[in-house]
């Protein structure tokens, strides 16, 4: 998902001398407003409009029948107001520990979802299938299937895009178009502001272990993705992911009353899109 929705396909679009790299997650969910059945198409920057929410978040159900890479995770609790706490999580990997502070004030709905998935051990024993070292500098993770097309059984809306900054250490959601965030996200190891449009919700920052991610990017990749980047030559996998602490007021993200679930209309039913890997 660098990054995408989910995740996983990086789309390189070249127009004259303008290069746009999209981080996608190809989880098979596509909003009706996009007007296209292809989740791998590079999204229009003008289509991405978002702001912070006070809740409820209103999750959109994904079609598991059309995408076997999705997991039936149920839906996160969806209280009102949505928690705005900072969730600090430890990603124990085969190369050391990466610590991330997820910013519940900047992206409450997406952080609530991440906390929920961590609680369900969704990210345990999960590979990071893609790294990119040209144009943008990222490691894409969060897909248990390792295909770049996986994710949970729901999607989350974009948040606070206008304030997004894709600097070193930032963590952002991968997506397949507006409001299609799932479980995939990407770590940015070097300022990638020039290579990324403000289409990706920033959910937090790396507070420990950025050197691990830098090494993965710097060691290169196999170039297996036709759109750019590929499988890291230095493999990175999450072994265990756990919440280390929660800071701030309000309820704890990932806990609360039953969620509000939105089921896409028949006209918005997605068409599976194969990912380039």
Language model: regions and residue ranges:
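Cyclophilin-like peptidyl-prolyl cis-trans isomerases
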Residues: 1-277
């Amino acid at each position: 998902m660098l990054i995408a929705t989910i995740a996983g396909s990086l789309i390189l679009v070249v127009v004259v001398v303008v290069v746009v790299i999209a981080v996608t997650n190809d989880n098979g969910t596509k909003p009706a407003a996009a007007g296209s059945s292809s989740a791998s198409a590079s999204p229009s920057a003008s289509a991405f409009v978002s702001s912070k929410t006070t809740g409820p978040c209103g999750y959109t159900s994904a079609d598991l029948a059309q995408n076997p890479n999705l997991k039936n995770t149920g839906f996160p609790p969806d209280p009102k107001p949505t928690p705005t706490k900072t969730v600090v999580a430890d990603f124990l990997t085969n190369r050391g520990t990466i610590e991330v502070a997820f910013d519940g004030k900047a992206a409450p709905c997406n952080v609530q979802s991440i906390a929920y998935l961590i609680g369900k051990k969704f990210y345990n024993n999960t590979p990071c299938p893609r790294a990119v070292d040209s144009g943008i500098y990222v490691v894409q993770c969060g897909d248990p299937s390792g295909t770049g097309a996986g994710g949970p059984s729901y999607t989350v809306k974009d948040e606070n895009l206008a304030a997004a900054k894709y600097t070193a250490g930032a963590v952002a959601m991968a997506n397949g178009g507006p409001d299609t965030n799932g479980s995939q996200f990407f770590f940015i190891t070097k300022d990638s502001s020039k290579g990324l449009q403000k289409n990706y919700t920033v959910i937090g920052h790396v507070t420990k272990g950025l050197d691990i991610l830098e090494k993965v990017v710097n060691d290169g990749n196999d170039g297996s993705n036709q759109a750019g980047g590929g499988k890291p030559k230095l493999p990175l996998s999450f072994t265990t992911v756990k919440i280390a602490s929660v800071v701030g007021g309000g309820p704890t993200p990932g806990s609360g009353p039953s969620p509000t679930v939105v089921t896409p209309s028949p006209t918005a039913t997605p068409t599976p899109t194969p990912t380039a890997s």
